[in-house]
Amino acid sequence: MKVGITASKSDDFSEWYTQVVLKAELADYAPVKGLIVLRPDGYSIWESIRTSLDVKLAARGVRNGFLPVLIPESLLGKEKEHFAGFNPEVFWVTHSGENKVGDRLALRPTSETLAYSLYSKWIKSWRDLPLRINFWNTALRAEIKSTKPFLRTSEFLWQEGHTVHACSEEAESEVAAILELYRETVEGDLAIPVITGRKSEKEKFVGAVYTTTMESMMPDGRALQMGTSHFLGQNFSRPFEVKFADKDNVEHFAWQTSWGLSWRLIGAMIMVHGDDKGLVLPPKVAPLQVVIIPISYSGEEGAQVLAAAEGMEAELLKAGIRARTDKREELTPGFKFHDWEMRGVPVRIEIGPRDLKDGSAVLATRHDGKKSKVPLDGAAVNIEEELCRVQTEMLGAAKRALDGMIHDASSYGALTKAVEGGGFVRAAWCGGLECEEKVKEETGADIRVVPEGGAEGACIVCGGRAASIPLFARGY
Amino acid sequence: MKVGITASKSDDFSEWYTQVVLKAELADYAPVKGLIVLRPDGYSIWESIRTSLDVKLAARGVRNGFLPVLIPESLLGKEKEHFAGFNPEVFWVTHSGENKVGDRLALRPTSETLAYSLYSKWIKSWRDLPLRINFWNTALRAEIKSTKPFLRTSEFLWQEGHTVHACSEEAESEVAAILELYRETVEGDLAIPVITGRKSEKEKFVGAVYTTTMESMMPDGRALQMGTSHFLGQNFSRPFEVKFADKDNVEHFAWQTSWGLSWRLIGAMIMVHGDDKGLVLPPKVAPLQVVIIPISYSGEEGAQVLAAAEGMEAELLKAGIRARTDKREELTPGFKFHDWEMRGVPVRIEIGPRDLKDGSAVLATRHDGKKSKVPLDGAAVNIEEELCRVQTEMLGAAKRALDGMIHDASSYGALTKAVEGGGFVRAAWCGGLECEEKVKEETGADIRVVPEGGAEGACIVCGGRAASIPLFARGY
Ligand SMILES: [Zn+2]
Ligand SMILES: [Zn+2]
C-alpha cells in the first residue's frame, strides 16, 4: 500500500473515500464482512461528537442509560409494522454455548421495543413525566451490499434517545428541539450544513407518526441523511402500555419520541471536507489540532529549534489546544508535511533556525493551504483564533457548495434531467405516494426532506394541486 | 412494591442488595434472563468511573478505539486454550434475517483474538510500538445461574485494554502500572480498599502468562475480584503473528498485555457502603452530591425559604458541585429525607424559616448520619470540604472493615474454620495445584490473590516448603 492518497476525489470518489479512511487510520475492516473497527483517531472524532451532544442533551434534562444488545423475538415483534421493517436485517442468536436458547434473541436493530417495555414499568403517574433517556450504543442491521466504512456497515455506533410525555404538544416540541440541537452539533462541530424538514410518509421511520430529518449533500451529488427525530404519537405507548395516571388519577397512554444520529456523520465529514491530499478535519473534532514540526535537528541549532517547538507545545496544551511536536528524526520535514496533511490536522507550525531568529514560526492551515507568520510569543492566543477562523471558513465553504447543489425544477422533464446531474432538486409535489414512487422508479431519486411551508402551483408529476416543495435526490 | 428498603443488610444480604439496586433505581431486569438495564443514576456512576479512568489512561498514552461485537468462530478458536475457556458461555449468531451465516459469529466474550488479528496488520516496525488501545464496550458471557445485577449478568459493561510492546520488561511494567492505576480509581473514587497481587496458575486468565488482580472483601464475607491486568507474553503474538521489525530490520514476536474492569465495581460499592436505609454513595461518583430540601412552602415564609434554597443550588452548581433542590410540594420533608437517603445522596441540606433567621442551614451527611450547621454565606466552600471529608471517611471505614476481615491461619484446621466464618484467610502455601484444589474442594475457598513477597515455613495443606502466603476466600 502506497503511503499517500493515490486516488483523486473528483475522478474516483469511492476509491478516494476508502483510501482516506484507511490511510488516515480512522478505521479498518474487521474480519467479518460488513463490520469495521475504529482506530484511535476515528474513535476520538466520535468521542468529540458524543461530548458535544451530551452537554446539549444534559441541558435539556436528558440523561444517559444502558440497554443490553439482546432483545427477545416476541418483544421485537410486538409492534407489527416496526418488526416487518427491521426483520430482514436482524442478526439472530440461537445458541449459548451448546444450548439452544428458547425465544430467539435479536441483536438490537433499534431499541424502541426494549426501552418501552421497561418504560411501562417505570412510569406510573404524571410525576414520572417527562422521561428523557438517551443510550450511546451500537445498532446491528445486516448489510448485504459491500461494506463502506461509516456509511454502510452491519454494526454502527449511534445514540438513540427515547422520551415520554404527558401531552402530544410537549412531545412534538421535543422532536423539533432535538432536531435543532442535532443541527447545531453537525453545523457547529463538523462544519456540515444541513437542510431540515420532514420525511414523506413513504420514507418515515417504521412505526412513527412522522419523522423529521436533517439532510446534507455529498460532493458526488448524492444526499446523506444526517440524523432523524421521530414523533411516535401513541403508536408504541398503546401496544407497550406506556401509561400514566394524571392528577385526577385518570390513566392515559403517553406520547413518545425517539431520535438518533450515528457515525455516518464521520463519513459525511470525510466526504464534504476532504481533498486529494486526504482528510481535512474541522478543528472542533480534530484529535490533533496543531502539529509542530521542527525543521532542523543537528547541533546547537537543532537543540534550540526543538526547545522552541516543545515550548510552544507546552503553551498550546496549557491553553487547552490539542497539540504535539513531531520529533521523529529519521523522517524529513517534507514527509511529515504530507503525512499530517493526509491525516487532516487543521494547523501545522514549522519552526526552523531562520524563524527562531526573528522570533516567529510559520503557520500553515490545512483547509486552504495558506501560510503565514506567527510570533512565538503568545502563540496560543493567535492559534486559538486561527482554529476558530478555520472552523468558520470550513462551514462557509461547505454552505456555498451545498447551495450550489440545490436546483429547481418546474417540470417533470427538468426534474429528471436535474436528478441525473446530481444534487438536490426542489420541485412541487401533490403529496401523493404514486407520484413519489414514479419519480423513484424512473429517476432513482427519493424525497429526502420536505422543508416547512406550503406550496403554490401544480405537482410536477401529476399536475394536481401542490402541497409542498420537497427536495428530491439520489441518496446513500 | 413498598417504597423503602424492607430487608436488613445483616439478616438477608442478598435480598437487601437486590432491593437497593431496584429501589434506588440504579438498574432493572431486562426481559431476557441474565440481562439488566441501567437507569440514569446507575449509568451516571459508570460514566464517572469511565471519565476518571480515561484521564489516567490518556496520561499513559492509552487511546480509545472501537471493536464490533461479532467475532467469527474460526478467529475466536485460534488460541486453543483461550477458546476452550470461553466456549461454554458464548452466544452464537447463526442467522441474519432469513439467511444462515457461514462461519458462526460469536458475541464477544472478550476481544483478544479480534484485536490481535488487527494489530498484526497495524504493527510493522519498532516505530509502531508501544501500541496502547483501550475499548469501552460490553462483553457477553451466558450466565446460567440466577441473575444478580452488576455481579452476575450475561452482558456487562467493561473496558478492555490491549497493549503491545517491543520487550517483555516494558510489557510487564505496563501490567503493573495499569493495576496501580486501577487501584487508584477504585480506592480514590469508589472508596473501596483493595489487595493487589497475582492470581494462582489455576485462577489466571486463560491464555495469559500470569494475571495480576485486585481483590476486595464484601460484608457477607465473600471476596470480589475488582479488576485484572494480564501479562500475555508472546502467547497471543505467536498464533496471531503480532510481529515487528527492529532497527536492524530483524522480525520479532511482540510482547502483550490485556486488562479490564467492569461494572461489578458498582456492585461492590453498593455492598461495601450501603446500609439498611439503602445506598450510600461516595461523593466522587454520586450522580447527585447535594440535595437541598426547603422545609416550608407556604406564604411569604415559604417564598423566602425557596429563594434561599435556589440561591444555594446556583452557588453549588457554579462551584461544580452536583446539586439539586427538591421542590416537590406534595411530599413532606420527612418523605424526602428517606427517599434521598435510600438513593445514597452524600449530603442533604435542610433550609427552614428558623435557619434562615440565623443565616444558616442544616447539613446532614449520609454515611454517618451526622447533622451540623452551615452558614448560608459561602456555603460552596464548606460543602466542598464536607464532600472531601465524606469521601475520605468512607474509604477509612471501608479499610477498617477490610482489615477486620483478614485472618491468619497456621494450620489446615484453622484455615477450614476461618473460611467458614467468612473473609480472607492468609495461609502459607507450597504453590502446588493439588493443595489449592484440596482447599477448594473441602472448604469452597479459592486462592483470591497472592501478594508480593515470599514465605517461610510450611504449606498448611501438605507441609511442604511454603512459597507464598496467598489470601484464600470464598468468592462471588
Ligand atoms: Zn402528484
Ligand atoms: Zn502444599
UniProtKB/Swiss-Prot annotation, chains A, B:
GO terms assigned for molecular function = ATP binding; proline-tRNA ligase activity
| Listed InterPro entries | aa-tRNA-synt_IIb (IPR002314), aa-tRNA-synth_II (IPR006195), aa-tRNA-synth_II/BPL/LPL (IPR045864), Anticodon-bd (IPR004154), Anticodon-bd_dom_sf (IPR036621), Pro-tRNA-ligase_IIa (IPR002316), Pro-tRNA-ligase_IIa_arc-type (IPR004499), Pro-tRNA_ligase_II_C (IPR016061)
The record's section on SUPFAM superfamilies has: C-terminal domain of ProRS, Class II aaRS ABD-related, Class II aaRS and biotin synthetases
**Database matches in Pfam families:** HGTP_anticodon, ProRS-C_1, tRNA-synt_2b
Q: Which reaction does it catalyse?
A: tRNA(Pro) + L-proline + ATP = L-prolyl-tRNA(Pro) + AMP + diphosphate
Principal EC category: ligase
CDD domains with a match to the protein in the record: ProRS_anticodon_zinc (cd00862), ProRS_core_arch_euk (cd00778)
Q: What does the UniProt record say this protein does?
A: Catalyzes the attachment of proline to tRNA(Pro) in a two-step reaction: proline is first activated by ATP to form Pro-AMP and then transferred to the acceptor end of tRNA(Pro).
Under what name is this protein listed?
Answer: Proline--tRNA ligase
Taxonomic source organism: Cenarchaeum symbiosum (strain A)
